[in-house]
Amino acid sequence: MSADQRVLVVGAGGLSSPVVRLLAERDIAQLTIVDDDVVDESNLHRQTLYTDADVGYSKIERAKIAVEAIRRGISVRTVEGRFLPETAMSLLRGHTMVIEGADNLATKFLVADAAHIAGVPAVQAGAVRWAGWAFCALPGSACLRCLFEDIPADRIETCAEAGVVGPVVGVLGALQAAIAFRLLEGERPRGELWHYDGLRGALRRTLVRRRGDCPLCNGEIQDLRVERYTAPCAA
C-alpha cells in the first residue's frame, strides 16, 4: 500500500467512529474529517470514538485527539462544517477516496454525486434500528443513484429519530473500513452492496449493476445544484 494515500471522512459520528479508529492505524499520508456537531452524551452508545470527557466538545476536535493518540505523527486535517454543494468539490480534491457516515440522505446523495463527478471512490453506509447497508461505488461502476434513485419526496426517519442499535452501527462502520482497506491495497470492489440484519446476525453481499436510466451514470447530473439536496431531512 502506498503511504501517499489521503482519505476524506464525511461525518464523525457512529458510522465513522470505527472507520477513523482503524484508519488511524494505517500508513496513510493524511486523514481529513468533516463535521459540524458536538459530542452528545445520548449518542455515546454508538459514537465509540468518544468518552464522557468529550461531551459538549467539537467532534472533529476530539476525533483528532483520538487519532493522534492511536498513531503519533499522522497528519489529521479537520474541517468544522458540513459537506455542502458549494464546498464538496474542493474538499474532495487531492483525496484518494471519500468515506461517508452522515445521518441524512441529502448528504449521502451529495457525497455520491460529487465523488462520481470527481472520479473518486466512495464508501457509504446507513443504519436504522437493527439493520443497515454499506456500499462501494467506483468510477465506472454502479453509483448510489443506481441503488436508491433519489432523495424521497416524503420525509423519512433518521437513525437519531427511529433509533439504532449501537453494535449495528459498529458493524456497518467496520465494513466501511474493511472496504476502504481493500481500496488502499489496490482492490476494486465495484458496486459491492452489503446488507446487515442485526436481529438475525446475517450479512449478505450483492453486486449492484448500473441502471441505464441513472441520471448520474448517464451524465445528466454534471453539477451540484443546491435544490437537488434540499429534501426534508435531519442534520
Question: For each predicted feature, which ranges?
Answer:
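Adenine nucleotide-associated cytosolic modules
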Residues: 1-235
